[in-house]
Amino acid sequence: MGNIHIQTKSKEYDVYVGKESLSHLTTIVQNMQPSVSNIMIISDEAVASLHLQTVVDALQIDQKVFSFVVPSGEKEKSFENFYAAHTSALENKLDRNSLIIALGGGMIGDLAGFVAASFMRGIRFVQVPTTLLAHDSAVGGKVAINHPLGKNMIGAFHQPEAVVYHTPFLQSLPEKEWRSGYAEVIKHALIGDVKLYHWLKEEVQTLADLRDEKLIHILMKAIPVKANIVAQDETEKGVRAHLNFGHTLGHALEKELGYGNITHGDGVAVGMLFAIFLSEQVYKVNLAYEEMKQWFLNYGYPKMPSDLSVERLVGLMKQDKKANAGTIHMVLMQEYGVVNVVSIPDETVHIALEAFQKDMVEK
């Protein structure tokens, strides 16, 4: 088991990673000042059926604990569920000394975190992630819900009190969720830890390798990449945007295909490949795109669908949060471990995306 210390301008906290990390939860709650009055656990139906009682049992405390459970799926990160969670919080008499526990993947972490950020103008919360994907979203304090016109468009920055990464919770994940989360691991390696990238290529031949000590090693290496960036730029005014590598096209694919029809990680994987494809053209460098593409395909990541409208995707990319005055801004790779936010003309993106789509179909 290991701990990773997160330090931002607004808060310091620890990420507990390992097979016994849930044992820290009671101590975390008991050490909070002022004392916690009561606890609301927010989860989804799939996770709650597997792990909710385990977390309740681990909370060896006197305070009242109740739960708010939503259906599973990215589409449930909605204003309706956000509002319903506030109603439940009020009905159960949460106050400013209450605590929210986010038990689930990235969708629940975002939803519960935004409820915590907005209820009575902000109360405390703890992240208890249950997916590999959430190694990214549970750290750093970005919380949000989706709008029909865009992903994560309504949200806030609200840091948790702690992150409890109990790795046994991940064992119930289906393969598509392992693959989805692993895309963010690859992202962290590509933008901030080249040694980790080479280790992944050697040690993770299939998704089945993401278990036990290898899993803990990956988490202990990938999370600090994000932690170091967040420490420099908590509210995404500069280098934190580098964490969006692959996300400009990735989010556009999620929106165009419909939330839940493609996992976040699959979208980001396609987005990273496109970013590398475009980076080779912009920077006139060899980033081994063909080798990278084959590596991704070997894990089962999808190709870009051939029937999608490039024009529509470019339009969605212009709605990305990094866009400025209608101009697409993408995170491009100058070399492994070195990325930059670059303004790209629509025509350049359109031509490159058409070529990328054609390449993915033909090969």
Swiss-Prot record:
Quick check: keyword Zinc in the entry?
A: yes
- Provide the E.C. number(s) assigned to this enzyme: 4.2.3.4
The protein's name: 3-dehydroquinate synthase
Can you tell me which residues bind Zn(2+)? E184, H247, H264
**Cofactor binding mode, per the note?**
Binds 1 divalent metal cation per subunit. Can use either Co(2+) or Zn(2+).
Q: Which reaction does it catalyse?
A: 7-phospho-2-dehydro-3-deoxy-D-arabino-heptonate = 3-dehydroquinate + phosphate
The organism of origin for this protein: Bacillus anthracis
> What family, per the record?
Belongs to the sugar phosphate cyclases superfamily. Dehydroquinate synthase family.
Q: In which pathway does it act?
A: Metabolic intermediate biosynthesis; chorismate biosynthesis; chorismate from D-erythrose 4-phosphate and phosphoenolpyruvate: step 2/7
Where does this protein hold NAD(+)?
Answer: S72, G73, E74, K75, E76, K77, T130, T131, K142, K151
Q: Which HAMAP family match?
A: DHQ_synthase (MF_00110)
GO CC annotations, alphabetized: cytoplasm
A Gene Ontology biological process noted in the UniProt record is:
chorismate biosynthetic process
Function comment: Catalyzes the conversion of 3-deoxy-D-arabino-heptulosonate 7-phosphate (DAHP) to dehydroquinate (DHQ).
Where, per UniProt, does this protein localize? Cytoplasm
Where it mainly occurs, coarsely classed, is cytoplasm
